A protein has these predicted regions:
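Compositionally biased, low-complexity repeat tracts
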Residues: 7, 26, 34, 168-171
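N-terminal secretory signal peptides and thylakoid transit peptides that target proteins
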Residues: 1-14
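Mature-region segments of soluble proteins
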Residues: 37-38, 50-59, 66, 73-183
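A generic secondary-structure signal for well-formed alpha-helical elements
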Residues: 14-22, 26, 64, 132, ...
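C-terminal segment of N-terminal export signals and the immediately downstream linker at the start
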Residues: 1, 17-55
């Protein structure tokens, strides 16, 4: 199994707290969310939160020879999940965690995370990655953001078909197919 495939499944697992239990599969739901994005504007994240989520998502999966998180509309994907699937309590905790990320950035010399140097951004995200077990605040928000970024990235059509080259090979059951035994 390739590294990106492993990360895809891990991302789906990390995003499960936001996904309703009646969904057929996490992958199918992610693909459906991407289909629904269309021209839907951000509804939960304000402009500052959009910029923060976009910056962090791109740090998690940057643009290289393959598309980055923003190229496959991961920030919009996250906003749609927050808007339509997260409970009011989950949404409030996530948004409070985003505020906490900016508060922690102030301790590193900038009033907002997006204004930190690249090295300081990585330093803060590394610290938050170690604090993901927190039940609230920046650690929780970063853990959810990381999971949703990976989930949104690997369930996008561009990544699934063009990067991972996933092809569905099940064409359904075909009964009464002529059979000639090999001699």
């Amino acid at each position: 199994m390739r590294r990106r495939e492993v990360v895809r499944f891990l991302g789906a697992a990390l995003a499960l707290p936001f996904i309703p239990s009646g969904a057929q599969t996490a992958i199918q739901l992610g693909e459906e969310i991407h289909r629904r994005l269309g021209d839907v504007p951000f509804r939960t994240l304000d402009p500052a939160q959009q910029k923060l989520v976009t910056t962090i998502a791109e740090l998690i999966i940057p643009e290289t020879d393959t598309p980055g998180a923003t190229s496959v509309r991961v920030p919009e994907f996250i906003d749609l999940i927050l808007t339509e699937w997260a409970s009011a309590e989950e949404r409030a905790a996530f948004l409070a965690g985003l505020t906490d990320i900016d508060t922690r950035a102030a301790a590193l010399g900038s009033p907002r995370f997006v204004d930190l140097s690249a090295a300081k951004k990585i330093e803060l995200l590394t610290a938050l990655d170690g604090a993901r077990a927190d039940k609230a605040g920046a650690g929780l928000a970063f853990g959810r953001l990381k999971g949703l970024t990976i989930y949104g990235y690997f369930t996008s059509k561009l990544v699934d078909q063009d990067i991972l080259k996933t092809q569905m090979f099940f064409n359904g059951y075909q009964g009464n197919v002529p059979f000639t035994p090999a001699v």
